[in-house]
Swiss-Prot record:
This is NADH-quinone oxidoreductase subunit K 2. It comes from Syntrophobacter fumaroxidans (strain DSM 10017 / MPOB). Keywords: Cell inner membrane, Cell membrane, Membrane, NAD, Quinone, Translocase, Transmembrane, Transmembrane helix, Transport, Ubiquinone. NDH-1 shuttles electrons from NADH, via FMN and iron-sulfur (Fe-S) centers, to quinones in the respiratory chain. The immediate electron acceptor for the enzyme in this species is believed to be ubiquinone. Couples the redox reaction to proton translocation (for every two electrons transferred, four hydrogen ions are translocated across the cytoplasmic membrane), and thus conserves the redox energy in a proton gradient. The lineage of its organism: Bacteria, Pseudomonadati, Thermodesulfobacteriota, Syntrophobacteria, Syntrophobacterales. Belongs to the complex I subunit 4L family. The keyword Transmembrane helix applies. The chain crosses the membrane at residues 1-21, 29-49, 62-82.
Amino acid sequence: MIVPFGHVLLLAGALFGLGVFCAVARRNLIMIVLGVEIMLNAASIAFIGAAARWQSMEGQAFVLFILAVAATEVSIGLAIIVYAFRRTGSFDPAAYNLMKAGDAMQSFERRGPQ
């Protein structure tokens, strides 16, 4: 039995909406990264469904590209999260001012040029 294309798009849209909610409504960096991953998987489902609908291989090629991007995003994102957690002790994004220019300049002024 073949699943209708509309059902595949409905599933992909529901997953994408869940991912957006998870990424926007949560106050935890790990949940934000998880939401982005859910959105990427929803896009993959839509591409696979479209490829099956029109019997083309471009959908599978896009999914391989999405998987590579997702793996890279997870590895870099988790490395940044681990670094930020070690520095602040919190997963709350509001606690992170790591890229604030004023702090870097004050630190430079205290130490002086090297």
